Amino acid sequence: NSGATELTAEEKEALDEGLIALDGSLPIIKDKEAFEEKYGKITVQTLGSADRTIDVADTAMVKKWTEDTGIEFEWTEIPSESATEKINLQLVSGADLPDVFWTFGDGKSGNTVVQYADQDIFLPTENIIDEYMPNLKKILDDNPQYRQEITAPNGHTYGFPYIEEMKGLVLTPGPLIINKTWLDELSLEVPTTVDEWVECLKAFRDGGDLNGNGEDDAIPMAPWFGADDTFGSYNMFYRFTGAFGCADSYCGGNEYADHLRLVDGKVTFTALDEAFRKTAEFFNMLYDEGLIWNGSFEADSSAAYTASLIKEDVARIGCMGVWTDQEITNLDVHDQYVAVPRLQGEAGMTGSANNYSELQDSSNTAITTTCKFPHVVALFVDYMVGDPEIAVQSNWGAEGYNYVRDEEGILATPLDENGYYAGGTEEWNTFGLARANTTPARGSMIVLDEYYDTVCRYTYDAVTLLEWQKVNGKDDILAEYDTIPRVLMETDELTRLAQIQPTISDTVDRYIVDWVTNGVTDESWASYQSELEAAGVNDLVEIYQTAVDRAAENEAGSASSESAASTSSTSSAS
């Protein structure tokens, strides 16, 4: 099955009878009643949301889609918590399959379709995209890395991608911030070098009652050394590796690729670089100076500063990382902080990039081989992709709930005078509730950077986050570092990664805590290296190198076959 675009017998018949249009015009189903009487509805399975209090079929966007396209899907919702189990049972038995899997759970579509790629369950879609989906094809042509990320190891694509561009928001950690009020009180400038930053921390340590609560309880810096980090935002260690000569990478959204970077085109395990040791020595100095919060080493995330210190009614922390400024719930405390500029160190600058992508799922809206109307589904996705206003509302929630038109006619989230959410309804009174109850979300929507301020306003609760990231040096960091693309892997590669990567990651985490508290010796550095080797670090690098090379070859192959097709040349460059 080569991703052929042969129409099914049912599609040919419905086309002959004038029930459907496959030329890109709307509606796609021209006579809904006659179509459904003859063929029934196209069935779609999605994941339920705890926030959704109505049937997905009754959401505003689903009704809008039917109004525009004539397609009324028959929706089945399965509980999110047991979704992976249920979907695997469906796929193993091959029984009870829907025509379309809307989603498999956040970030899970790629591995799922690869795992079942040789079972003839999912329809390859690369040719359908090229021949029937001009809107999606253009986006993939304009962004070769996205085509690379949706191509399975066998060269096929399955389903269609979910892309949420937000000006690179998830491609670097959340902001590193410092208490400007305390700096002012101590007559200090915002630091621009690592040395100046250390001097600021020492001043916070010795500054007495900086927050005015009558106690000497200012904490100079609060990192958190546990796992479950959000986009590498809380563990300050990795931010400083670049200052010592080799930036590391750490990101919960793609954890198998933690500590990997492309350096001169080669996959490199950066936590073995000498810079990592120097960073550990530096953090041990900070610890010995009494600058690091003593709660930073708890294993349980409910004990992290983000769940405790950051929520108090007075500022407690001099410098910390956050994923979003909204984590600081007290407005007065919030307004004391500013972002730290990228700091110059002895052998480079601070900051790191995440091995992540704004293409969050490669294979949503996955069409099964039993679907009688695959081209109708494909044209539906291209309708959703091709109309930016539909794409934005399908992703984040409907107009009249999460969006109103501002004075320029652009979709904007309604906010009160304090900048808090003021949309939705009495029952759906948060952005999340109004989203869940007006769209199924997380299918194959595509939101592009170019839509901001032309179609919709930038997501209201991420405005400060992005500004602060830019102060941290986001643009330069993204230009300087080559990250590991989120490529799809063979099932046996994933199995091996699942065996070795958690041990590798735990080893790094364990040694960091030991080094920060006890210092680094030649012996401990040597035992760290040998433990990582025994855990399979060379295999890890090799698997990623193979996957990255294969994806590049697949991309070159598809590019050369396209150019060959366009010049009708007979030579092949595969």
What function would you assign to each model-found segment?
Residues E126, P153-Y238, D258-K311, T365-V376, ...:
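Helix-loop-helix "hinge/cap" segment bordering the ligand-binding cleft or interdomain interface
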Residues N1-W197, F244-C251, E255-D258, V267-A271, ...:
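Conserved N-terminal structural module of periplasmic/extracytoplasmic solute-binding proteins
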Residues G40-T43, T69-E74, G94-D99, D120-L123, ...:
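Loop/turn elements at helix/coil->beta-strand transitions in domains of secreted/extracellular proteins
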Residues G48-S49, Y383, D387-D514, G519:
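Conserved small-residue motifs centered on glycine
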Residues N111-N127, T329-S352:
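Ligand-binding "clamshell"
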Residues G48, W197-C200, I292, I328-L331, ...:
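Conserved luminal/periplasmic juxtamembrane motif of membrane-embedded glycan-processing enzymes
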Residues S80-T84, D300-A303, E346-A347:
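Short acidic loop-to-helix transition motifs that present clustered carboxylates
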Residues T279-A280, N284-L291, A304-D325, V333-Q336, ...:
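Glycine-rich, aromatic-lined ligand/substrate-binding cores of catalytic
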